[in-house]
Amino acid sequence: MLKYGGTKLSTKTANNLISVSIDLCRDYTQIAYCMGNMAEPDSVSTIAGEQKYLIPTEIGKLNNSDEWCIGDDALLREKNGEAILADDILKTILSEKSIVVSNNTYTGYEILKHFFEGLFKILKSNYHIVQPDYISVTVEYPDRILVNLIRNVLNDMGYDREHVKIIGHSESIIYYMISQKKEIWVNDVLIFDFTKHQFLVRLLTTVRAREPQPIVVEEMDMTQKFKVSDLQTEQGRLEMDTKFLELLKKLCSKHIVSAVFLTGVGFYEKWMEDSIRFLCSKRRVFQGYNLFV
């Protein structure tokens, strides 16, 4: 049995099953949920009734207390002097170093468990979802250390391992793409992921000479050339538009591209002009935060 809004529902009925997806990234985390009778998942807002879907991947410990806070709440409390933040938690976890908060030392497992508890608290308070049946977690790269930590955390929170799936962004994109209309991926597909920390280009190609036809993902890291910090000035935004246009022309000269996806906070800085005009010529272009969740 599971609880939804305080009402017990049978997990044996497909329409009552609740799946929760979590996209855990270095800069932001997102959550979505889906019930069996929903056509597609709904993104979870951190503020009820608003469209606030990005949760900063930040965690803090309240001063003189055992309580923890996450996301914007942690940032606000740290600003007000009410909490101390852990520094860049995913990067530190992957380095297998201990994490120091308020002069206390914590393991990556402990910090990640507090963060996930904060995420599920949002689900419970804003959406009345108490215990989902299935959980999928997407991460930028399915590093063994991080994957094992996530599995252990969720298992200790009461979620059976067989009901938890953890995949990387590249695999997640394939699942997402094949769920779309075939006209979108009839040719190659480009995905640009522009976050605070990286600029990744992924090219999805369907190998039509083989049966069944596999989808191959080629990944290019162009972080050194495209940085969010370069968008702080008007000149930087103009130069970014020019560089991105050059990259697009180069890629589209080598590949027949039927669709382009733009995701990440970097694409919401309103710097694309010539580049977006080029993109939208004879191609389907999609922009959004929740490509991986």
List each model region and its residues.
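ATP/nucleotide-binding catalytic cores
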Residues: 127, 142-145, 149-161, 174-202, ...
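Conserved phosphate-binding loops in N-terminal lobes of ATP-dependent enzymes
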Residues: 45-138, 216-257
